[in-house]
């Protein structure tokens, strides 16, 4: 019963789209229909600059961290804790309050992994930066980092490997359009002057 309640609360919290709310606060275009059409920090940065993007990023991370920390302190078993993290990500991807049109949940997924340990967070961040430096593809860096997350978790806290694997599968599924563009050579690189506006090129 408690796990079910936390699952619902995590989904509802995840459904609060900070990208849309911050864009309205700063009188920016709706990120769902402008830029890359992705309501996330990257697109908000494209539409409005660093300050609103940072606010979106922080809130999206907290959407994952807060419910998982709550589940952790309520002593939910690892599988239930993982489902809470998945619920937060699902809320971000398919927000109840915004027509079920959400983002890709990379920041929210990262936030949901923070309670496992800062060492895991550090490994994921380092992996992302290394891959961006090598390939210049932000989406590929995110995919590699999230794909390695179960391995990192197994090395640090093995009991959470299965829940983290759930999140990995969810994030990869959400990035299927990016994967297709990577294979076709049409995925924009970091620092490109102009990304296609008719495709969801954000991570």
From Swiss-Prot:
Membrane topology according to the record: Multi-pass membrane protein
Domain of life: Bacteria
Transmembrane segments: 2-22, 54-74, 80-100, 114-134, 153-173
EC nos: 2.3.1.275
Database matches in InterPro entries: G3P_acylTferase_PlsY (IPR003811)
Chief place of localization: membrane
Signal peptide feature range: none
GO biological process terms, semicolon-separated: phospholipid biosynthetic process
GO molecular function: acyl-phosphate glycerol-3-phosphate acyltransferase activity
Record keywords: Cell inner membrane, Cell membrane, Lipid biosynthesis, Lipid metabolism, Membrane, Phospholipid biosynthesis, Phospholipid metabolism, Transferase, Transmembrane, Transmembrane helix
Enzyme class: transferase
Cell wall biogenesis/degradation recorded as keyword: no
Family (UniProt): Belongs to the PlsY family.
Protein name in the entry: Glycerol-3-phosphate acyltransferase
UniProt organism field: Pseudoalteromonas translucida (strain TAC 125)
Species lineage: Bacteria, Pseudomonadati, Pseudomonadota, Gammaproteobacteria, Alteromonadales
Gene coding for it: plsY
